[in-house]
UniProtKB/Swiss-Prot annotation:
The gene is gatA. Belongs to the amidase family. GatA subfamily. Gene3D superfamilies: Amidase signature (AS) domain (3.90.1300.10). This is Glutamyl-tRNA(Gln) amidotransferase subunit A. It comes from the Bacteria. Its EC number is 6.3.5.7.
Amino acid sequence: MHQLTLAEIARGLADKKFSSEELTKVLLARITQLDPQLNSFISLTEELALEQAKAADVRRANGESGALLGAPIAHKDLFCTQGIRTSCGSKMLDNFKAPYDATVVSKLAAAGTVTLGKTNMDEFAMGSANESSWYGAVKNPWNLEHVPGGSSGGSAAAVAARLLPAATATDTGGSIRQPAAFTNLTGLKPTYGRVSRWGMIAYASSLDQGGPLARTAEDCAILLQGMAGFDPNDSTSIDEPVPDYAAGLNGSLQGLRIGVPKEYFGAGLDPRIADLIQNSIKELQKLGAVIKEISLPNMQHAIPAYYVIAPAEASSNLSRFDGVRFGHRCADPKNLEDLYKRSRGEGFGPEVQRRIMVGAYALSAGYYDAYYLKAQKIRRLVKNDFMAAFNEVDIILGPTTPNPAWKLGAKNSDPVAAYLEDVYTITANLAGLPGLSMPAGFVDGLPVGVQLLAPYFQEGRLLNVAHQYQLNTDWHTRTPTGF
């Protein structure tokens, strides 16, 4: 039962082959048995899950239907869940129980999903390895000595290990797509504004976007259907109709123009990954796609711009965690300043502190123009490069990551080395574009992803291309040994 995809679960529940309650019990037992090896969950919500599963079964018995009705999922632990700890992977929020549900959580609950728990993540979503979590590192089910990617590493590891069919995640600079690549999953970062950020604890407000992590493009389509849509509570949410993503998965790729940026294949890319990307290109050509070389000339400036903008926004967003209203508070503060300093010093881990300091520096009076303003100008240039490219092509294709998953601890002493692993993913966040990573093969037994980017609100196009690719390849069906 644990091998079933979301689409298969929907069919099984509709055909009364099993109930949501039966499935939920199987998966909860599996999580209890196997997750100690992975550390992919921060909180398990067994009582809530069984309650929701029973309610979903009653709804089905009363004639209701729906692809997500009775489907078990988990939420990345930065989506607020009413009455349940929402920690953001940080000591700062270890004692925080959200007083309300995030829009994503309430929308999916209304669609009938069953919440199995909250997944581990890099602290405040800052990281690409899921090693900065206060609850300990998450391990990659494909090789327990390697990282699963970050910051949505818990969601990725849990889905890859077949502990559940799909999970919610968020992407600020690649935090859905990079873990998807490292764990052989399909992960989609939607257009900025497609999925509500209300109740999603902010890292960098102009870059953060929630999306699905699953094993197939079809499952991503099903989960995105439940997450997407306008939300008046989120001022950055965009009132754009949500298409039927699953119904759009049958389009031919004949004549589809795929752009391959020459900048993607320079120094720094593992040549074995480059070969796998070429194989993916050949597969799509067989399906009728036309390949064109394009250029994204400002890509080289994207990482420095991102690592000014994201920490700058984080330093502002994280100023609310001061030990006063919620979150960690130091013991016996001498005065208000001592309360602030010690609460924040004790509550935030080293990577979060590093980014707050970088961000505060970039926003400071003497350096604002030199750093923050310049980074925003580069952001505009990156966006313009994509606009020009999409005048000529329908999709942009390249590697998701320059290297496969590294060993746990390998990049801890050199944060910049870890930052450089985001080189292919951050441009989509800077430009607000939708991006998808799908399985493309293996290097030394570790999964590799191929990334697709599309124009604004063309998530359906990405999902269709990925679905057609997955109908003709079997990388996405491979399972890690021992799970």
